[in-house]
Protein backbone atom coordinates (compact mmCIF):
# COMPACT_ATOMS: atom_id res chain seq x y z
CA UNK A 1 0.00 0.00 0.00
CA UNK A 2 1.22 3.48 -0.84
CA UNK A 3 1.17 6.08 1.93
CA UNK A 4 1.11 9.86 1.49
CA UNK A 5 1.80 12.14 4.43
CA UNK A 6 0.65 15.71 5.08
CA UNK A 7 2.20 17.85 7.84
CA UNK A 8 4.61 14.96 8.35
CA UNK A 9 6.57 16.37 11.26
CA UNK A 10 9.19 13.81 12.19
CA UNK A 11 7.24 10.93 10.65
CA UNK A 12 5.73 9.25 13.72
CA UNK A 13 2.19 8.96 12.37
CA UNK A 14 3.52 7.61 9.08
CA UNK A 15 5.63 4.98 10.84
CA UNK A 16 2.63 3.89 12.92
CA UNK A 17 0.52 3.52 9.77
CA UNK A 18 3.28 1.57 8.04
CA UNK A 19 3.47 -0.82 10.98
CA UNK A 20 -0.30 -1.23 11.28
CA UNK A 21 -1.47 -1.27 7.67
CA UNK A 22 1.76 -2.14 5.87
CA UNK A 23 2.97 -0.22 2.86
CA UNK A 24 5.62 2.31 2.00
CA UNK A 25 5.83 6.08 2.11
CA UNK A 26 5.29 7.39 -1.45
CA UNK A 27 5.67 11.11 -0.66
CA UNK A 28 5.37 13.55 2.19
CA UNK A 29 4.55 17.23 2.63
CA UNK A 30 6.53 19.15 5.24
CA UNK A 31 7.99 22.67 5.44
CA UNK A 32 9.81 22.79 8.80
CA UNK A 33 13.56 22.61 8.01
CA UNK A 34 14.61 20.32 10.88
CA UNK A 35 11.79 17.88 10.19
CA UNK A 36 12.54 17.94 6.45
CA UNK A 37 16.16 17.04 7.14
CA UNK A 38 15.22 14.06 9.31
CA UNK A 39 12.51 12.88 6.90
CA UNK A 40 14.93 13.04 3.97
CA UNK A 41 17.55 11.04 5.91
CA UNK A 42 15.05 8.35 6.92
CA UNK A 43 13.27 8.24 3.55
CA UNK A 44 15.90 8.60 0.82
CA UNK A 45 14.41 9.08 -2.62
CA UNK A 46 10.93 9.87 -1.27
CA UNK A 47 9.82 13.28 -2.58
CA UNK A 48 8.78 16.14 -0.31
CA UNK A 49 5.85 18.01 -1.88
CA UNK A 50 6.54 21.00 0.37
CA UNK A 51 3.85 23.51 1.30
CA UNK A 52 0.42 21.85 1.20
CA UNK A 53 -1.20 25.17 0.27
CA UNK A 54 0.75 25.22 -3.00
CA UNK A 55 0.39 21.61 -4.16
CA UNK A 56 -1.55 20.87 -7.36
CA UNK A 57 -3.13 17.56 -6.30
CA UNK A 58 -4.03 16.70 -9.91
CA UNK A 59 -0.29 16.21 -10.48
CA UNK A 60 0.28 13.98 -7.43
CA UNK A 61 0.13 10.20 -7.67
CA UNK A 62 -2.78 8.85 -5.64
CA UNK A 63 -2.09 6.84 -2.49
CA UNK A 64 -3.98 4.13 -0.62
CA UNK A 65 -3.50 5.77 2.78
CA UNK A 66 -3.25 9.48 3.53
CA UNK A 67 -1.99 10.63 6.94
CA UNK A 68 -1.99 14.10 8.42
CA UNK A 69 -1.40 15.86 11.69
CA UNK A 70 -2.68 19.27 10.59
CA UNK A 71 -1.82 22.31 12.75
CA UNK A 72 -3.41 22.20 16.20
CA UNK A 73 -3.08 25.89 17.15
CA UNK A 74 -6.59 26.84 15.95
CA UNK A 75 -8.12 24.25 18.33
CA UNK A 76 -5.68 23.92 21.22
CA UNK A 77 -6.73 24.72 24.79
CA UNK A 78 -3.25 26.22 25.19
CA UNK A 79 -3.92 28.90 22.57
CA UNK A 80 -6.54 31.48 21.63
CA UNK A 81 -8.80 28.89 19.92
CA UNK A 82 -9.58 31.04 16.89
CA UNK A 83 -10.73 28.05 14.85
CA UNK A 84 -11.44 29.01 11.24
CA UNK A 85 -10.27 32.58 11.93
CA UNK A 86 -6.73 31.37 12.70
CA UNK A 87 -4.29 31.74 9.79
CA UNK A 88 -2.95 28.29 10.72
CA UNK A 89 -6.36 26.68 10.09
CA UNK A 90 -5.26 24.35 7.30
CA UNK A 91 -7.94 21.65 7.46
CA UNK A 92 -9.53 23.00 4.23
CA UNK A 93 -6.29 22.19 2.37
CA UNK A 94 -6.32 18.66 3.80
CA UNK A 95 -9.91 18.26 2.58
CA UNK A 96 -8.89 19.37 -0.92
CA UNK A 97 -6.10 16.76 -0.95
CA UNK A 98 -8.43 14.00 0.25
CA UNK A 99 -11.08 14.91 -2.33
CA UNK A 100 -8.54 14.94 -5.17
CA UNK A 101 -6.57 11.81 -4.19
CA UNK A 102 -9.47 9.64 -2.91
CA UNK A 103 -7.32 7.41 -0.67
CA UNK A 104 -8.95 4.25 0.70
CA UNK A 105 -7.94 5.18 4.25
CA UNK A 106 -7.34 8.56 5.92
CA UNK A 107 -5.60 8.78 9.31
CA UNK A 108 -5.63 12.18 11.03
CA UNK A 109 -4.27 13.41 14.36
CA UNK A 110 -4.84 16.55 16.41
CA UNK A 111 -5.28 17.88 19.95
CA UNK A 112 -8.18 16.83 22.17
CA UNK A 113 -9.46 20.44 22.14
CA UNK A 114 -10.40 19.90 18.50
CA UNK A 115 -13.36 17.82 19.72
CA UNK A 116 -15.06 21.01 20.94
CA UNK A 117 -13.98 23.31 18.11
CA UNK A 118 -14.07 22.45 14.41
CA UNK A 119 -14.29 18.69 14.81
CA UNK A 120 -17.87 18.47 13.56
CA UNK A 121 -16.82 20.30 10.39
CA UNK A 122 -14.06 17.74 9.75
CA UNK A 123 -16.37 14.75 10.25
CA UNK A 124 -19.09 16.36 8.09
CA UNK A 125 -16.60 17.06 5.30
CA UNK A 126 -15.26 13.50 5.41
CA UNK A 127 -18.83 12.21 5.22
CA UNK A 128 -19.63 14.51 2.29
CA UNK A 129 -16.64 13.00 0.46
CA UNK A 130 -17.91 9.46 1.06
CA UNK A 131 -15.86 8.46 4.12
CA UNK A 132 -17.00 6.65 7.24
CA UNK A 133 -14.98 7.88 10.23
CA UNK A 134 -14.14 6.55 13.67
CA UNK A 135 -12.19 8.48 16.28
CA UNK A 136 -10.77 8.18 19.74
CA UNK A 137 -8.57 9.99 22.24
CA UNK A 138 -5.20 8.52 23.24
CA UNK A 139 -2.87 9.89 25.91
CA UNK A 140 0.80 9.97 24.96
CA UNK A 141 1.57 8.08 28.16
CA UNK A 142 -0.56 5.19 26.82
CA UNK A 143 2.14 4.75 24.18
CA UNK A 144 5.03 5.04 26.65
CA UNK A 145 5.74 8.78 26.47
CA UNK A 146 6.73 10.52 29.72
CA UNK A 147 3.75 12.92 29.50
CA UNK A 148 0.00 12.51 29.31
CA UNK A 149 -0.99 14.93 26.54
CA UNK A 150 -4.14 13.66 24.88
CA UNK A 151 -4.48 13.50 21.11
CA UNK A 152 -7.46 12.67 18.95
CA UNK A 153 -7.01 10.16 16.14
CA UNK A 154 -9.47 9.87 13.27
CA UNK A 155 -9.48 6.87 10.95
CA UNK A 156 -11.74 7.27 7.93
CA UNK A 157 -12.45 4.69 5.25
CA UNK A 158 -14.07 5.15 1.88
CA UNK A 159 -17.51 3.60 2.20
CA UNK A 160 -17.14 -0.15 1.65
CA UNK A 161 -13.35 -0.15 2.04
CA UNK A 162 -13.10 -0.94 5.75
CA UNK A 163 -10.78 -3.87 6.36
CA UNK A 164 -12.10 -6.79 8.43
CA UNK A 165 -9.08 -6.64 10.77
CA UNK A 166 -9.91 -3.01 11.56
CA UNK A 167 -13.42 -3.67 12.87
CA UNK A 168 -12.34 -2.53 16.35
CA UNK A 169 -11.17 0.90 15.14
Kindly give the residue locations of the regions a language model identified:
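A generic structural signal for ordered secondary structure
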Residues: 8, 14, 47-49, 118, ...
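Class I S-adenosyl-L-methionine
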Residues: 55-65, 70-169
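S-adenosyl-L-methionine-dependent DNA methyltransferase catalytic core
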Residues: 1-27, 31, 35-40, 62, ...
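Hydrophobic/aromatic anchor residues within beta-strands of the central parallel beta-sheet
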Residues: 26, 47-48, 106
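S-adenosyl-L-methionine
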Residues: 37-60
Amino acid sequence: MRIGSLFSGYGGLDMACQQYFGGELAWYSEIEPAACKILAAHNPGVPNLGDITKVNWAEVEPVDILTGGYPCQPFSQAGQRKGKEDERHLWPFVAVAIDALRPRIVVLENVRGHLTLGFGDVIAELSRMGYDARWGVVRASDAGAPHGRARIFIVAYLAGERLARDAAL
